[in-house]
Amino acid sequence: MPEQALLEEVVDKVRPLLGQGKVANYIPALANVDAGKLGIAVTTIDGETIGAGDYLEPFSIQSISKVFSLTLALTLYEETEIWSRVGKEPSGHSFNSLVQVELERGKPRNPFINAGALVIADLLQSRLGAPKHRMLELVRALSQNDKVCFDKQVADSEYQHSARNAAIAYLMKSFGNFQGDVDTVLRTYFHYCALKMNCADLSRAMLYLANRGKTLDGTELISQVQTRQLNALLATSGLYDGAGEFAYRVGMPGKSGVGGGIIAVIPGELSVCVWSPELDNQGNSLAGTAMLEHLSQRLGRSIF
């Protein structure tokens, strides 16, 4: 288990990087976040959580939610039903690319770009009567925090700026790879992205990725094989176009969001969440990546 002093050291180490990135500004609710925030939390497979910095302050998890939605889909569908509609390959294009959807005839490259996450949301909408409520139940149980909620302001703001995601959904629908009502699925998708959680919540919630699919209370959420496969996808596609750089520097499966959060895992040991709202050119937390790099170096841990 990393010691408290190490996490404090990690936060202090990256503080000089503040001011070098840019906060996401495509919706006001994200643009107004204090850019100077820094937080880190670690949860070990024995269930202990420690943190440093602003690790208890909630933030918009954005694309980190795509890990939860894919996990939920894996509990509801046969794997062939999922992977016949979305691929497992890195994208190489922007996370909201229309060009790639067109070129690949409506099948997204992976579940962590917007097109892929929209297909997963479409699957959940088709199978669940109340997909937003089911997601909230899941993340509250995983994080052991009943106060986790959706930020309605963020969800509404995302919906008001939804033209590109709607275009992606309709393009996939034209190829027969989107079954539900586009507007309904978009509203569900934006609620997922608008989940508010803190670093401690997320490090606890993602522990199943480090613990062979078992949650904090020992329940098997997904199988050991599915967990290994999900971690492989996170290692290759979890950081937008920065996945290779992240693997090189950090050496952990991870998933980022434009709210400035990144989750990562060391299988068999721990899950970690960092948060710093300023992003690099790939849309990943600049100081957050540096925190994870420093942590992995100090722990001497990497999956490679």
Swiss-Prot record:
InterPro entries reported in the protein's UniProt record: Beta-lactam/transpept-like, Glutaminase
Entry keyword annotation includes Cytoplasm: no
UniProtKB keywords: Hydrolase
One of the protein's GO biological processes: glutamine catabolic process
Binding, substrate: 63, 114, 158, 165, 189, 240, 258
Pfam families: Glutaminase (PF04960)
GO MF, any single term: glutaminase activity
Catalytic activity: L-glutamine + H2O = L-glutamate + NH4(+)
EC number(s) given by UniProt: 3.5.1.2
Coiled-coil ranges from the UniProt annotation: none
Keyword Cytoplasm: no
Catalytic EC class: hydrolase
Top-rank taxon, per record: Bacteria
NCBIfam families, sorted: Gln_ase, PRK00971.1-1, PRK00971.1-2
Description of how the protein assembles with itself and partners: Homotetramer.
Similarity comment: Belongs to the glutaminase family.
Protein name (database record): Glutaminase
Gene name linked to the record: glsA
